[in-house]
Every structure is written in C-alpha cells, then in structure tokens.
C-alpha cells in the first residue's frame, strides 16, 4: 500500500509538467498558424506633412533657367524626345527654356545659358545658327545632340567638331546598349534592345572623342560620346530611341555636359507582393502539381512563401504585400465580410514580422471604375454600379485590414491590375484619408494608371512600379537599368498567383522563376550596393523629399 501511495504521488507531481508541455505545444501551434505576432519596424513618421512638401512643379518654377532646349514641333520624333526631356530635366532639377524652330529661326542669346540640348536630327532649320552654337561651345559652353543626326549640309559642317572622323549615308541596327562601367550604374555589360531597328548613324569617331557607350557585336557602333571643342564640349547620343524606357541613358548623357553634375534622387528599392495576403488563389495549378505533386494551398505555404522569405533574407528586401479580401466579382455595393481569416493572419503577420508592410489592393479584384469604362474583351472585369458601391467596397477593405492588423500602419494602395479610373482616383482622395500612396504603373498600357515619381496636387504620392513578375525579360532589364540611373530607384511587383497563369510564366515552373528573381536581385544590389531597401510607404517618403 505504501508503495502504491508513493507511485500515485509521483504520477500526480508529473501532471503539471505534462500539462506545461501541452500548453507550450499549443502556443507554438498558435504562433505558427497566426504567423507569430509582428513587431513593428516601421517609423511612423515616414511621410512629410502635406503642407511641407514642395511638389515638382513648384520646384521647377523656382529654378534658374540655365539650359536651352531646341526642338522642331514639325517633326514627330522631335516631339517624342521633347516629351521625355521635359520630365528628365524636371526630375534633374534643371531649369530650361525651349525654342521651337517651327516658330522661330533664332536660338537667341546663348551666353544666357550654361548648357544646350538639341532635340533635332535635321539641322537645316537652324542653318547658320549651328555655327553660332559651335562658337558658343568653343568659348566654354556645353551642347548635347540627343537625336541620331541625319547626313545633311549643316551636319557636315559640325562633324569634326562633334568628334566624327567619317560618316556614311546609312544607318545601323542597334540590338544592344553597352555602357562603360564608369559611365552608368550597372555598366560594363550588354543590355538587349527588343525590336531593334536601324536607328544609329554609321559613323567612325576620331581619336579625340571619348566613347562612353556603344552597341557591341560585329561592328562596335558608337552610341554616346563626348568631344572637347575649344573650352567647351559636345555630347552626342546616337541611339535613335526616344521612349520612357531609356530616360536614364539621356540623363546620364546630360550629366556629361558638366565636370560635376548633382541632382536629387530617390535612392530606394521596393518589392511588392500583389494579392498578398489573400484567399487561396484560383487558377490552374497543373504546373505546381507537375513540379511538386501538391495542391495550390500547400505550395504557397510550404514552398513559395519560404523561398520568398529566403530571398528577402539574402538581399535585405522588405516586401510590401497588398491585401485582396476576396476574389468575387460582385460590383453592386453589397458587401460580404471575409470570414476565413487564417491565411490573412498567418501570412500577414509573418510579413510584418520580417520587417515588411501591409497595404491595400481591393475588397475584390475589380478595379475602381464605373460604367463609362469599357473593358471589352481586353480585361475580364466588371465595372461598379455607382460611386457609392465603390465607396462601400473601399470602406470594407480598410475596416477588414484594421481588424486583421490593428497595430500596423497602412497607407499604400495598389489598383487591381494597375487600373484606376478618374472617378476611382477622386474617391480615394476624398473618402480614404488613410491612403497616402498610390503605387501603379510606370508605363502606359491598356487601361493602366500611368504614373511619374511625384506628389499629386491632393498630396497623395504617385509611386509607379517599373517592372513586374519573375520572368524579367530583356525589356524589363533595360527599364530597370535605365531607372536605376535616372532616379536611383527600383520598384518591382509580382503576384502570388503568377504560378497559375501561363502568361506570367507558370509553364517555366517556380524553380526557374525563383532563379530569375535571385539573378535580378543579385544584379541590382551588385550594381547599386548603396541602394536602400524600403517598404512602399518609406519609398513614398523618399519621393516626397
């Protein structure tokens, strides 16, 4: 009996230990399923007060006009490149005056300027004014010919002054751009030009000219060079491409006009995860099953998300994820609150815990657009019944995010599919004061809300995303390289459901797409080791400044 009593006491004493083990296991399971509660890393004062922000237009109006821009509105190409230079010079904080040779035949008093940018390929409208320009450069001025020049009488008068030893009457195809390492960030390698055409003048440079960029291949085609002339210099761009995707090349070329060129840049890199957190994405999971033999839900939890976090750890990336509450297509303003929240808690809290940020994407994936927007067969979306319906949807999204992440500061809105109508934009400014940033698209596209890096009149920061997906094709690489040199910025987004869509690389498989992302991030941070990793709101704070 005595022995039995001792045994019973021992069993009783062991119960608290066993209970403690079970409680620890339960706590660990809860933490795992909820993503572990986040610790806020974000500085709550990343934004400037709206009244303290000096907008780009205001700053431009105050600039001393030190640059003369010469163009010809009768020439479509001249108009195209002038459109780009308007933004380039604004962002570089260079004050300028424009002369349109369709309206005048005189350059005016050149001594009033420090630099001149000639946006003309045909110099005949300038006539003898080109000789006055040459004399001004010889006396210490700096002039840039930004367009591929035509072989004509007045150009021939300038050839030697521009550092051209000989020139043909033909043009050569430019299928890549190779900047020297000292000329541009990310230099020392080829950047493929998609859809190349004969855009460069077939010329040979003199030994005096200093070459900064060329097209490598069978022939080394000079694309950017400078040539000293007297006390001044000429800079020539022989690229023949005048689109937004190559602004960084022109800004770098403009910087050659002075011995030291300084202008404010953003200095920031932001990676976005669109549709994240969200319900389990719909779509075709055949490539996931092909490669891993598991369903979509398990793939995202056990493979995709750990890999995304591993890349963040490797490169110091702090993702900004933007929430989709549901994938329904209802647009009548009747709201159904999301009841299944475990994925939002798990992935969202994990994202925050790793120094990331949560933003807004949509109550559903229907862009904020009314019936006056006609998608046709281009986009598979519905339009909203009225403004009240859109407002109901946004109110629900904001409330849902507050419930999911009550301690997080959320201010960034990403339009579904980068589509945002004028009415939707007005709604955000008028009814959603929480939203301080709209992050959409840098380039034009079907129904795309195209942006510049700027602060809008209503104080909302416009923050375009430059490239997307994990495919990272040649065009995206060129765009990323260009903007790294224009604004010292990177903005990239991908969707959590890219692996369910062949158009976004699903057939390549996640291993290949992951390698592409790894390679891109490696290039980015090797090329620009001083580039700051920021969240979406932090990048907006940098844009404000």
Feature-to-residue mapping (PLM):
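N-terminal Sec-pathway targeting helices
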Residues: 2-22
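Catalytic domains of cell-wall/extracellular-matrix polysaccharide-remodeling enzymes
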Residues: 20-26, 386-457
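A glycine-centered loop/beta-turn motif at secondary-structure junctions
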Residues: 63-67, 142, 198-268
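Metal-dependent polysaccharide deacetylase catalytic core of the NodB/CE4 family, i.e.
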Residues: 65-73, 138-139, 145-157, 313-423, ...
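Helical hinge/lid and interdomain linker segments adjacent to catalytic or ligand-binding clefts
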Residues: 74-152, 302
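A glycine-rich, often tryptophan-bearing local segment used as a flexible ligand/cofactor-contacting loop or short
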Residues: 124-190
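Active-site beta->alpha N-cap acidic-glycine motif
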Residues: 242-252, 256-350, 354
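C-terminal domain-boundary segment and adjacent tail
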Residues: 252-270, 307-320, 403-405, 432-453, ...
């Amino acid at each position: 009996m005595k022995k039995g009593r001792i045994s019973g006491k021992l069993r009783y004493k062991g119960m608290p230990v066993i209970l403690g083990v079970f409680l620890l296991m339960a706590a660990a399971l809860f933490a795992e399923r909820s993503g572990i509660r986040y610790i806020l890393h974000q500085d709550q004062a990343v934004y400037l007060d709206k009244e303290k922000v000096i907008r780009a237009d205001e700053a431009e109006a105050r600039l001393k006009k030190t640059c003369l821009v010469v163009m010809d509105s009768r020439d479509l190409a001249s108009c195209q490149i002038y459109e780009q230079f308007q933004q380039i010079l604004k962002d570089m904080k260079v004050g300028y005056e424009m002369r349109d040779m369709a309206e005048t035949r005189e350059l005016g008093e050149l001594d009033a300027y420090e630099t001149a940018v000639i946006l003309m390929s045909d110099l005949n409208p300038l006539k003898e004014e080109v000789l006055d320009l040459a004399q001004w450069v010889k006396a210490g001025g700096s002039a840039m010919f930004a367009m591929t020049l035509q072989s004509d009488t007045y150009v021939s008068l300038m050839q030697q002054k521009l550092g051209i030893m000989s020139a043909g009457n033909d043009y050569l195809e430019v299928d890549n751009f190779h900047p020297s390492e000292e000329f541009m960030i990310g230099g020392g390698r080829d950047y493929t030009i998609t859809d190349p055409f004969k855009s460069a003048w077939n010329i040979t440079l003199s030994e005096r000219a200093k070459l900064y960029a060329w097209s490598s291949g069978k022939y080394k085609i000079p694309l950017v060079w400078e040539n000293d002339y007297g006390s001044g210099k000429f800079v020539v761009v022989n690229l023949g491409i005048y689109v937004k995707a190559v602004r960084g090349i022109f800004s770098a070329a403009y910087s050659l006009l002075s011995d030291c060129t300084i202008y404010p840049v953003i200095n920031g890199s932001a990676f976005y995860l669109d549709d994240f957190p969200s319900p389990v994405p719909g779509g075709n999971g055949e490539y996931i099953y092909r490669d891993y033999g598991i369903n979509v839900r398990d793939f995202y939890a056990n493979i995709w998300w750990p890999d995304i976090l591993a890349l963040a750890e490797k490169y110091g990336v702090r993702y900004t994820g933007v929430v989709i509450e549901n994938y329904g297509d209802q647009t009548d303003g009747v709201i159904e609150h999301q009841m299944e929240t475990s994925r939002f808690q798990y992935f969202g809290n994990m994202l925050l815990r790793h120094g990331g940020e949560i933003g807004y994407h949509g109550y559903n994936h229907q862009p904020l657009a009314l019936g006056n927007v006609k998608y046709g067969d281009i986009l598979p979306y519905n339009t909203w019944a009225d403004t009240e319906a859109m407002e109901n949807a946004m109110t629900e999204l904001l409330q849902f995010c507050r419930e999911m992440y009550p301690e997080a500061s959320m201010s960034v809105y990403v339009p579904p599919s980068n589509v945002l109508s004028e009415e939707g934009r007005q709604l955000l400014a008028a009814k959603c004061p929480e939203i301080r940033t709209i992050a959409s698209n840098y380039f034009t596209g079907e129904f795309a809300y195209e942006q510049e890096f700027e602060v809008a009149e209503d104080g909302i920061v416009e923050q375009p995303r430059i490239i997307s997906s994990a495919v990272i094709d040649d065009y995206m690489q060129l765009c990323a390289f260009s903007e790294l040199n224009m604004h010292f910025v990177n903005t990239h987004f991908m969707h959590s459901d890219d692996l369910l869509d062949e158009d976004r690389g699903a057939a390549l498989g996640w291993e290949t797409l992951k390698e592409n992302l790894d390679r891109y991030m490696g290039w980015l941070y090797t090329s620009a080791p001083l580039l700051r990793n920021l969240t979406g709101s932090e990048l907006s704070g940098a844009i404000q400044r």
